[in-house]
């Protein structure tokens, strides 16, 4: 096989063979390969909207929301399966809670949503023929995934499904690693869920697998699973957590850019938990969230920010406050984020940067006063303005720096002020130019 020219089918096979990594390690330990020109073009077509979107909403919601003590409560508190199952009798959210999620996402400037259709606890939020342990056959009495899909579409948002391969509830969920008959039963159960999700809800934009413990790609029959997904949803994009490389990588709770043109998305919480945790008050500030979004956009990635609704589907007030603040900033400054390009300039004591074409956006987190300076910018500046108001900003450029002058002593915008800098070409920064070229006094 010529690994430099692989069809999608051969590519999936190779990834299945080479991607046996520990469940706790979400990286992909596979040899670098290149797709055929046709497969590259197909991936670019499918991912175009995603690269432009930059910002999405993650929703972790399930039976653990009833307990309100973290989404891993079943495992971390050693709850027996029969005891945990009783939570399904208390999980009866208010109708169409997802409408509030979607409206909040749109106000926050997010362009897509990803909801947990089944988390590690094994409870299915969708109607399935495989088990009675699902929302339509328990207290909720309805398909919660269907409500979510309809809500997202009503707000013009792209639809993503999270699905956990690991399952603490299914009898074969652990023994499948040692018992071939159990593996076959369990894999058929999982593949049936994926088929139902890809068949019953119209066009789906993202499939977001999670935790592939305890099997490898061969055990999960991941190649077969992905081929089914693409057959049923030819425009979908999939992540890398079923032990195949997929279309994009998923650094968790950190911002870590991929090398080359590999797509990536940082998923992060607003506090310390993915699911609703009533006692977790360690909330990130809107400023921190905005800085994270800027950092992701700067390095060519996406930012998937999580909320953990309560059992009734309502959103914690602090999440609403944070996302509303982020949305107010995005209303004025979203141009610097959406459809932005990887940005080489990155060094400043008080700012970070994004880029769109030849326009450099300096996001000033710590306002220095009436003058903002950027050292080592090697591209000639044509003009500058405050992005939120369009107000012209005066500047002076010499070989060492660009100084933007005549600004107010107090930051014009809260929590981050953005200066749009139009350059003659793609903006480039030499990080050691000043150190190397600045004239020094003779001793």
Please tell me what each predicted stretch does.
Residues 27-28:
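Cleavable N-terminal signal peptides
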Residues 12-22, 31-443:
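Mature catalytic domains of secreted/periplasmic carbohydrate-active enzymes
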Residues 1-10:
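N-terminal secretory signal peptides
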């Amino acid at each position: 096989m010529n690994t430099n020219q692989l069809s999608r089918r051969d590519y999936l096979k190779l990834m299945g063979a080479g991607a046996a990594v520990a469940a706790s390690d979400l990286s992909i330990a596979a040899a670098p390969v290149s797709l055929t020109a046709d497969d590259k073009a197909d991936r670019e077509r499918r991912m175009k909207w995603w690269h432009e979107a930059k910002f999405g909403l993650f929703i972790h919601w399930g039976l653990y929301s009833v307990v309100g003590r973290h989404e891993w409560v079943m495992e971390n508190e050693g709850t027996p399966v029969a005891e945990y199952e009783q939570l399904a009798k208390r999980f009866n959210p208010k109708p169409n809670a997802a409408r509030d999620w979607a409206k909040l996402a749109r106000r926050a400037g997010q362009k897509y949503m990803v909801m947990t259709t089944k988390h590690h606890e094994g409870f299915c939020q969708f109607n399935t023929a495989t088990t009675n342990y699902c929302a339509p056959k328990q207290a909720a009495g309805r398909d919660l995934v269907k409500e979510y899909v309809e809500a997202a579409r009503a707000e013009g948002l792209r639809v993503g499904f999270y699905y956990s391969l690991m399952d603490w509830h299914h009898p074969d969920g652990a023994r499948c690693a040692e018992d071939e008959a159990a593996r076959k039963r369990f894999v058929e159960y999982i593949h049936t869920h994926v088929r139902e999700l890809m068949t019953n809800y119209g066009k789906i934009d993202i499939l977001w697998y999670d935790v592939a413990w305890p099997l490898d790609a061969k055990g999960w029959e991941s190649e077969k699973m992905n081929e089914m997904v693409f057959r049923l949803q030819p425009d979908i994009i999939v992540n890398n957590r079923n032990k195949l490389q997929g279309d994009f990588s998923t650094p968790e709770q950190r911002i870590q850019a991929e090398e080359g043109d590999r797509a990536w998305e940082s998923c992060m919480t607003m506090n310390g938990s993915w699911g609703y945790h009533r006692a977790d008050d360690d909330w990130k500030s809107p400023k921190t969230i905005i800085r994270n979004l800027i950092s992701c956009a700067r390095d060519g990635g996406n930012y998937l920010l999580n909320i953990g609704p309560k059992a009734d589907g309502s959103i914690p007030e602090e999440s609403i406050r944070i996302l509303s603040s982020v949305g107010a900033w995005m209303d004025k400054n979203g141009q610097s984020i959406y459809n932005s390009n990887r940005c080489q300039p990155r060094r400043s004591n008080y700012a970070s940067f994004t880029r769109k074409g030849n326009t450099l956006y300096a996001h000033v987190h710590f306002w220095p006063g009436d003058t903002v300076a950027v050292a080592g910018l090697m591209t000639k500046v044509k003009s500058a303005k405050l992005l939120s108001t369009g107000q012209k900003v005066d500047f002076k450029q010499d070989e060492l720096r660009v100084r933007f002058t005549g600004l107010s002593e107090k930051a014009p915008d809260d929590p981050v002020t953005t200066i749009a800098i139009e350059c003659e070409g793609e903006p480039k920064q030499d990080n050691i130019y000043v150190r190397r070229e600045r004239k020094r006094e003779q001793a």
